[in-house]
Amino acid sequence: LLWFSVWDKNNAFYLGGAFSHLNRANQSFDSDIYDGLYSKFTIHSGLDYIFPYSRFGLSPGIVTFIQGPSLQVNGGVNLKFLLSGNRRTYEAFQFGTWVRLANKVDSGILADALILSTRFDYEQFGIGFSYDMNISSLRQATNLNGSFEFSGIYNICGPERRNVYCPRF
Protein backbone atom coordinates (compact mmCIF):
# COMPACT_ATOMS: atom_id res chain seq x y z
CA LEU A 1 0.00 0.00 0.00
CA LEU A 2 1.46 3.38 -0.98
CA TRP A 3 0.11 6.88 -0.52
CA PHE A 4 1.91 9.83 -2.06
CA SER A 5 1.46 13.54 -2.42
CA VAL A 6 3.05 15.32 -5.36
CA TRP A 7 3.54 19.07 -4.99
CA ASP A 8 5.05 19.64 -8.42
CA LYS A 9 7.24 17.87 -10.98
CA ASN A 10 10.25 17.57 -8.63
CA ASN A 11 8.82 17.41 -5.10
CA ALA A 12 6.84 14.58 -3.52
CA PHE A 13 6.18 12.79 -0.25
CA TYR A 14 5.27 9.13 0.19
CA LEU A 15 4.09 6.87 2.99
CA GLY A 16 3.34 3.19 2.73
CA GLY A 17 3.19 -0.18 4.35
CA ALA A 18 3.02 -3.89 3.74
CA PHE A 19 1.93 -7.00 5.60
CA SER A 20 3.61 -10.35 4.86
CA HIS A 21 3.06 -13.96 5.98
CA LEU A 22 -0.65 -13.52 6.63
CA ASN A 23 -1.25 -17.28 6.98
CA ARG A 24 1.69 -17.80 9.43
CA ALA A 25 3.02 -20.88 7.63
CA ASN A 26 4.39 -23.79 9.64
CA GLN A 27 8.18 -23.73 9.44
CA SER A 28 8.75 -26.87 11.54
CA PHE A 29 10.31 -29.98 10.01
CA ASP A 30 8.23 -32.13 12.38
CA SER A 31 4.61 -32.45 11.21
CA ASP A 32 3.43 -32.93 14.82
CA ILE A 33 4.82 -29.55 15.94
CA TYR A 34 3.50 -26.20 14.75
CA ASP A 35 6.10 -23.42 14.59
CA GLY A 36 4.33 -20.54 12.88
CA LEU A 37 6.29 -18.01 10.89
CA TYR A 38 5.84 -14.56 12.41
CA SER A 39 3.89 -12.05 10.34
CA LYS A 40 5.99 -9.16 9.06
CA PHE A 41 4.98 -5.51 8.98
CA THR A 42 6.81 -2.98 6.81
CA ILE A 43 6.32 0.78 7.10
CA HIS A 44 8.17 3.22 4.84
CA SER A 45 8.20 6.94 4.25
CA GLY A 46 10.27 9.45 2.32
CA LEU A 47 10.52 12.78 0.64
CA ASP A 48 11.93 13.94 -2.67
CA TYR A 49 12.72 17.65 -2.47
CA ILE A 50 14.57 19.88 -4.96
CA PHE A 51 15.63 23.26 -3.60
CA PRO A 52 13.92 26.22 -5.35
CA TYR A 53 15.82 27.63 -8.37
CA SER A 54 18.39 24.86 -8.03
CA ARG A 55 19.36 21.48 -9.45
CA PHE A 56 20.16 20.11 -5.99
CA GLY A 57 17.86 18.37 -3.58
CA LEU A 58 17.49 15.93 -0.73
CA SER A 59 15.80 12.53 -0.63
CA PRO A 60 15.46 11.42 3.01
CA GLY A 61 13.74 8.16 3.82
CA ILE A 62 13.02 5.58 6.47
CA VAL A 63 11.82 1.98 6.35
CA THR A 64 10.88 -0.11 9.39
CA PHE A 65 10.52 -3.91 9.49
CA ILE A 66 8.79 -5.63 12.42
CA GLN A 67 8.62 -9.42 12.51
CA GLY A 68 7.86 -11.12 15.84
CA PRO A 69 10.48 -9.98 18.35
CA SER A 70 12.72 -8.54 15.61
CA LEU A 71 12.86 -4.87 14.67
CA GLN A 72 14.98 -3.24 11.96
CA VAL A 73 15.02 0.41 10.91
CA ASN A 74 16.90 1.78 7.89
CA GLY A 75 17.08 5.56 7.68
CA GLY A 76 19.15 8.06 5.78
CA VAL A 77 19.33 10.74 3.16
CA ASN A 78 20.57 11.02 -0.42
CA LEU A 79 21.85 14.22 -2.02
CA LYS A 80 20.30 14.55 -5.47
CA PHE A 81 21.62 16.38 -8.54
CA LEU A 82 19.43 17.02 -11.58
CA LEU A 83 21.74 16.59 -14.57
CA SER A 84 19.45 17.58 -17.40
CA GLY A 85 19.02 21.29 -17.98
CA ASN A 86 15.98 20.95 -20.20
CA ARG A 87 12.45 19.90 -19.33
CA ARG A 88 12.18 17.21 -21.99
CA THR A 89 14.42 14.63 -20.36
CA TYR A 90 14.84 13.63 -16.73
CA GLU A 91 18.38 12.73 -15.65
CA ALA A 92 19.46 12.66 -12.02
CA PHE A 93 22.32 11.35 -9.93
CA GLN A 94 22.14 10.84 -6.19
CA PHE A 95 24.34 9.52 -3.42
CA GLY A 96 23.97 9.30 0.31
CA THR A 97 24.47 7.58 3.61
CA TRP A 98 22.03 5.45 5.54
CA VAL A 99 22.22 3.57 8.83
CA ARG A 100 20.62 0.27 9.79
CA LEU A 101 19.42 -0.07 13.38
CA ALA A 102 18.21 -3.35 14.88
CA ASN A 103 17.12 -4.58 18.27
CA LYS A 104 19.54 -6.69 20.27
CA VAL A 105 18.40 -10.13 21.33
CA ASP A 106 18.82 -9.33 25.03
CA SER A 107 17.90 -5.61 25.09
CA GLY A 108 18.44 -2.24 23.48
CA ILE A 109 19.06 -0.97 19.98
CA LEU A 110 22.14 -1.79 17.93
CA ALA A 111 23.64 0.36 15.15
CA ASP A 112 24.27 -2.55 12.82
CA ALA A 113 25.46 -1.14 9.49
CA LEU A 114 26.42 1.97 7.59
CA ILE A 115 25.04 1.96 4.05
CA LEU A 116 26.61 3.98 1.23
CA SER A 117 24.32 4.35 -1.77
CA THR A 118 24.35 5.85 -5.23
CA ARG A 119 21.79 5.94 -8.04
CA PHE A 120 21.47 7.21 -11.60
CA ASP A 121 18.07 7.93 -13.17
CA TYR A 122 17.26 8.47 -16.83
CA GLU A 123 13.62 9.11 -17.74
CA GLN A 124 11.67 6.27 -16.09
CA PHE A 125 14.71 3.97 -15.70
CA GLY A 126 17.20 3.88 -12.87
CA ILE A 127 20.15 1.86 -11.68
CA GLY A 128 21.38 1.83 -8.11
CA PHE A 129 24.33 0.52 -6.17
CA SER A 130 24.83 0.31 -2.42
CA TYR A 131 27.39 -1.10 -0.04
CA ASP A 132 26.49 -2.22 3.49
CA MET A 133 29.41 -1.99 5.91
CA ASN A 134 28.98 -3.73 9.26
CA ILE A 135 29.72 -1.35 12.16
CA SER A 136 28.38 -3.42 15.07
CA SER A 137 30.24 -5.99 17.16
CA LEU A 138 29.63 -8.42 14.28
CA ARG A 139 32.41 -6.64 12.37
CA GLN A 140 34.89 -8.96 14.13
CA ALA A 141 33.38 -11.88 12.24
CA THR A 142 33.19 -10.02 8.93
CA ASN A 143 36.51 -8.08 9.11
CA LEU A 144 34.51 -5.00 8.12
CA ASN A 145 33.65 -6.70 4.83
CA GLY A 146 30.21 -5.64 3.74
CA SER A 147 27.92 -6.59 0.93
CA PHE A 148 27.14 -5.05 -2.44
CA GLU A 149 23.63 -4.52 -3.71
CA PHE A 150 22.53 -3.58 -7.21
CA SER A 151 19.04 -2.43 -8.12
CA GLY A 152 17.17 -1.82 -11.33
CA ILE A 153 14.30 0.66 -11.26
CA TYR A 154 11.46 1.15 -13.70
CA ASN A 155 8.76 3.74 -13.01
CA ILE A 156 5.53 2.78 -14.72
CA CYS A 157 4.48 6.39 -15.23
CA GLY A 158 5.94 7.66 -18.49
CA PRO A 159 7.41 11.07 -19.28
CA GLU A 160 4.20 12.50 -20.77
CA ARG A 161 2.88 15.70 -19.27
CA ARG A 162 0.12 15.35 -16.69
CA ASN A 163 -1.88 17.54 -14.39
CA VAL A 164 -0.82 15.20 -11.58
CA TYR A 165 2.78 14.06 -11.86
CA CYS A 166 4.00 10.57 -11.07
CA PRO A 167 6.56 10.84 -8.24
CA ARG A 168 10.19 9.98 -8.96
CA PHE A 169 11.56 8.14 -5.90
Please identify what each model-predicted range represents:
Residues L1-I43:
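Hydrophobic, aromatic-enriched interface-forming segments
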Residues D35-F169:
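Outer membrane beta-barrel transmembrane domains
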